[in-house]
Amino acid sequence: MVSHLFLVQRSEVRILVGQPYMNNLLDRIFFRSRNLDYINQNLINLTNQTPANKIFEALNTYSDNSEVRYVGGCIRKIIKKETVDDIDLATNLTPSEVCDALKKKDIKFYETGVEHGTITAIIDEYKYEITSLSKDVTTDGRHAKVEFSLDWKEDAARRDFSINSIYSDKEGNLFDPFNGKKDLESGSINFIGEAENRIKEDYLRILRYVRFFLMPHRLHLVLNLLLDQYHQRFLFL
């Protein structure tokens, strides 16, 4: 029963209660649509306007099931409408398969950290880190022993923060199992899983948390907090 939301006057329907809510809802829907179009188009541009398209071709055509996606900083920066200065990729191929795929397309590469599944491809002096999907087998607070995986969500689950677990194919279709885009747009930094457990797995994660928290667009929050604390202390002198 929603008749209480409307008043009929001279054949005109006017929303009395609920108009601000509906307007806000529609604004959010259209904003998300426009924003998603912007993200999709810029990820497509990133593929078409950089040598990354050669890596996508090499890895996506390696086998019937092979796939490579953008991950990490390049997606964060596109969502935040910042300049992309590096490109990281994730793939369901093993490191040896990545090397084989790159060789077949005459793409130069070197093994950056093959024990953790990372190969660096070099095209026109640009470097692209390609990391195989994996899951942690054991951790000691700094180093992790990993096992390669075919599961994208399993790979996402081992990452530190939701904003680092956003993937995209070359067409700009996002895979975001932990709502990292939403957190990024709202300025939230959330650990994946229990924060205490994630920090125990790798103690450097707390430093990365601080680094993300102190990004330029958040500095005013820190300054306001410090000023507020100073003001409170001054009042009690």
Give short role names for the model-derived ranges.
Residues M22-L237:
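Catalytic cores of the polymerase beta-like nucleotidyltransferase superfamily
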Residues V2-L5, L225:
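Compositionally biased non-globular segments, especially hydrophobic aliphatic-rich helices
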Residues L5-L7, L16, Q232-L235:
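Short hydrophobic targeting helices and cationic amphipathic motifs
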Residues R10, P20:
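Cationic, low-complexity basic patches in intrinsically disordered or flexible, solvent-exposed regions
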